[in-house]
């Protein structure tokens, strides 16, 4: 069965535009990259449901991830997190890069509880091989979890001391 030429043209257009916009990222032009990625996402969002192939949805995931990266570089972390959450919720719950970016963002905000939550989801849905691609993030969250656990143990020990007096 032949591929629908409209769908093939959409995929080609999306891929070409993504590649052009990726070049802006490589040059450090994050503002223009943001605009480019948002235009492509807008194009995809305006496609009819029957035009949304798995390949187009995969491109959407990658474009949203790249958009999140650009926004992170622009120090717009809160906005960047929304796109990573959209990827995990709506496109690919096994996309380890989004979990890693979210964990890192929450740790930067000193929100260890949210970082820990996304780390648990990452461990649930992603392969060990995928998780190992982000050693710095994993070391950081493991360290934060260990510190929090030690802090809680210290409080519990203090409670016991005061309760026994």
Indicate residue ranges for each PLM-predicted region.
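N-terminal alpha-helical interaction modules that lie
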Residues: 1-47, 144, 149-165
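Boundary/linker segments of alpha-helical solenoid repeat arrays
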Residues: 47-51, 94-98, 124-137
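Alpha-helical linker/edge segments of TPR/alpha-solenoid repeat scaffolds
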Residues: 62-75, 108-118, 128-130, 138-164
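Start-of-helix signal in alpha-solenoid helical-repeat scaffolds, especially tetratricopeptide repeats
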Residues: 7, 12-15, 54, 58-61, ...
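Alpha-helical adaptor scaffolds
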Residues: 26-97
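Conserved positions within tetratricopeptide repeat
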Residues: 34, 81, 116, 123, ...
């Amino acid at each position: 069965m032949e591929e629908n030429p409209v769908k093939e043209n959409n995929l080609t257009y999306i891929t070409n535009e993504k590649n052009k916009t990726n070049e802006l990222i490589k040059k450090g032009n994050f503002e223009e990259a943001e605009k480019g990625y948002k235009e492509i996402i807008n194009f995809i969002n305006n496609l009819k449901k029957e035009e949304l192939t798995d390949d187009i949805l995969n491109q959407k995931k990658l474009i949203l991830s790249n958009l999140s990266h650009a926004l992170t570089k622009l120090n717009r972390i809160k906005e960047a997190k929304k796109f990573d959450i959209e990827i995990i919720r709506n496109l690919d719950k096994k996309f380890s890069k989004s979990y890693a970016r979210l964990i890192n963002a929450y740790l930067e905000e000193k929100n260890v509880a949210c970082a820990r939550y996304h780390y648990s989801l990452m461990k649930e849905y992603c392969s060990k091989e995928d998780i190992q691609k982000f050693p710095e993030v994993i070391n950081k969250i493991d360290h934060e979890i260990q510190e929090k656990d030690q802090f809680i143990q210290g409080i519990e020990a203090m409670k016991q001391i005061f309760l026994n007096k």
